[in-house]
A protein has these predicted regions:
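Generic structural signal for well-ordered, non-membrane alpha-helical segments
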Residues: 1-4, 8, 21, 25, ...
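A glycine-rich phosphate-binding loop feature that marks nucleotide/adenosyl-phosphate handling sites
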Residues: 25-29, 186, 235
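Flexible glycine/proline-rich
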Residues: 2, 18-30, 34-35, 48, ...
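Short, low-complexity N-terminal leaders and the immediately following helix N-cap/first helix
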Residues: 1-68, 95
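Short, glycine/charged-enriched hinge/interface segments at domain edges or termini
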Residues: 2, 55-228
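Short gly/pro/ser/thr-enriched loop/turn and capping motifs at secondary-structure boundaries
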Residues: 11, 109, 195, 260, ...
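Short glycine/threonine-rich loop/turn motifs
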Residues: 206, 212-214, 221-286
């Protein structure tokens, strides 16, 4: 009799990594990456604004405060997904939305809250100029190209279990399919003359085959593909025939038939078909 830890170690010593396969990104939740994923692009691709506000040259805002705003001339506006055609020069500003590329000449973004835009709108003044209420520093509210993921860098490591956040990363890299480890096929076989399939009427003295469904659900829960072999009756020929149906599976789980009773034939059949590495485990219940 061996411990649970020893049993797991022995079982895992027979385990090999399964072959990779490509899976559509939308179907990859819970799958395991088969290889490292490298980025072909910068994320973000260009320097862009982290705030809604005004793209400016920081030195144009020197000394700005709520009591002494710096007035800049507005020369354009740019939204996310577009490139500004104008160039920011000293004393000018471009109204910019979050995610929009930083216009040429700008080195800072002053958020709307640090301008007098709302005051000007309330006074129904045309937005040809803007008052800056706080001095900016170079790089303020700018996300640099490649700040999140740089081109050529590893974005995700092999062996990563894909969660929604990793799927989002892969989508941001333009990956519509990903290399993942094939899901193991796990054959599930219940044994016993007392068992009845849940689709059948229940005769006196019999019980429904519940273990198969519980085990299959566990297989699915942990990423496997259950293959239901049904019920094998308590005789060697029937059990051998059922076990042979699992030859194309990666793993076989049997339920019952492993004690020392006259009808417990699983051990004998397995010994005839292969090698029994261990049999009893020190655990309760067991």
């Amino acid at each position: 009799m061996i411990s649970v830890e020893e049993a797991l170690e022995k079982v895992l010593s027979y385990v090999d990594v399964l072959e990779p396969e490509d899976e559509p990104l939308l179907n990859s939740l819970g799958r395991v990456l088969a290889e490292d994923v490298y980025s072909d692009i910068n994320i973000p691709p260009l320097d862009n604004s982290a705030m809604d506000g005004y793209a400016v040259q920081a030195e144009s805002t020197e000394g700005a405060s709520s009591t002494s705003p710096r007035i800049l001339r507005i020369i354009g506006e740019v939204a996310a997904g577009y490139i500004a055609t104008e160039e920011v020069t000293p004393g000018t500003a471009i109204r910019i939305m979050t995610g929009a590329p930083i216009p040429k000449g700008a080195d800072a973004v002053v958020q709307f809250e640090d301008t007098d835009e709302e005051k000007r709108k309330a006074a129904k003044k045309p937005l040809t100029e803007i008052g800056i209420l706080r001095q900016a520093v170079k790089g303020l509210n700018i996300r640099g190209a490649g700040e999140d993921i740089s081109k050529g860098s590893m974005a995700l490591k092999a062996g990563t279990v894909l969660r929604p956040q990793e799927i989002g990363v892969l989508a941001s890299l333009g990956k519509d399919a990903v290399p993942v480890i094939r899901r193991p096929v796990v054959a599930v076989l219940a044994t016993g003359d007392e068992l009845v399939d849940i689709k059948e009427p229940l005769p006196p003295g019999k019980i429904y085959n519940s273990n198969t469904y519980s085990l299959a659900a566990q297989v699915s829960r942990y990423g496997g593909v259950p293959k239901i072999l049904g019920i094998a009756r308590d005789n060697i020929k029937a059990l051998e025939d059922k076990i042979k149906q699992a030859r194309d599976a990666d793993l076989l789980i049997t339920s019952a038939g492993v004690s020392v009773g006259e009808y417990d034939v699983v051990k004998d059949v397995l010994a005839r078909l292969g090698e029994v590495t261990f049999w009893t485990v020190r655990m309760k219940p067991g």
